[in-house]
Amino acid sequence: MAVGKNKRLTKGGKKGAKKKVVDPFSKKDWYDVKAPAMFNIRNIGKTLVTRTQGTKIASDGLKGRVFEVSLADLQNDEVAFRKFKLITEDVQGKNCLTNFHGMDLTRDKMFSMVKKWQTMIEAHVDVKTTDGYLLRLFCVGFTKKRNNQIRKTSYAQHQQVRQIRKKMMEIMTGEFQTNDLKEVVNKLIPDSIGKDIEKACQSIYPLHDVYVRKVKMLKKPKFELGKLMELHGEGGGAGKPSGDEAGAKVERADGYEPPVQESV
């Protein structure tokens, strides 16, 4: 019999000794997710993060997290087919302050609108808001039968499709270019732009089911805490000295040394 080490036996202890199981949730904390003041329901849920440990700070793990929330949950509404994306930009205490990050229609709504015997018209445009956010907007609309129409199909001619697409782009650019992000979100909640496009295109070809189907965030300006606090309705003067609190610069000669005090 060959004499040698038994490699199967682990060093110092029984073979296959069990590791102590540590519950991963014992090292984590719950944080509240707060939606901006444009929405009726501000507290949209909770999120988990590992506690601050050494150089790994908990708030850094939360910043940049994106939450997709149905408009029904944000507005306390029963019927809503739009989903809003909210991104965590700052953490205050146990609250994650979020900002608008995008919008989308639900899949079932999008699929329910696509039918036979009609023309689907899509348009997209890049718009910069007054406060420096660059958004890409996607719009969709469908042709419908005229009131006295007998024919089964309602297809628009290529020239009409181009005219409608041009109108869509003009209206979206005009509506969003002159507003800041807060006003843009306020317009997206009821989707008033879809109704405006429907009215404007009535003379070219009657439309129905016109929606801004998607909003993508392409570029953001540099993060400012004051602006985020304004969005959350908590005032913009966070961390700034007000009026009398602002200090004045004291002029001192070069090589100045304070006098030695006799008693402290």
From Swiss-Prot:
Matches recorded under PROSITE patterns: RIBOSOMAL_S3AE
Main location: cytoplasm
Signal peptide extent: none
Region of interest (Disordered), ranges: 233-264
Record Pfam families: Ribosomal_S3Ae (PF01015)
GO annotation, biological process: translation
Subcellular localization: Cytoplasm
InterPro entries: Ribosomal_eS1 (IPR001593), Ribosomal_eS1_CS (IPR018281), Ribosomal_eS1_euk (IPR027500)
A cellular-component GO term for this protein: cytosolic small ribosomal subunit
Superkingdom of origin organism: Eukaryota
Positions with biased composition (Basic and acidic residues): 242-255
Single GO term (MF): structural constituent of ribosome
Keywords: Cytoplasm, Ribonucleoprotein, Ribosomal protein
Similarity comment: family membership: Belongs to the eukaryotic ribosomal protein eS1 family.
Complex and partners: Component of the small ribosomal subunit. Mature ribosomes consist of a small (40S) and a large (60S) subunit. The 40S subunit contains about 33 different proteins and 1 molecule of RNA (18S). The 60S subunit contains about 49 different proteins and 3 molecules of RNA (25S, 5.8S and 5S).
PANTHER family: 40S RIBOSOMAL PROTEIN S3A (PTHR11830)
Protein name: Small ribosomal subunit protein eS1
Organism field: Eimeria tenella
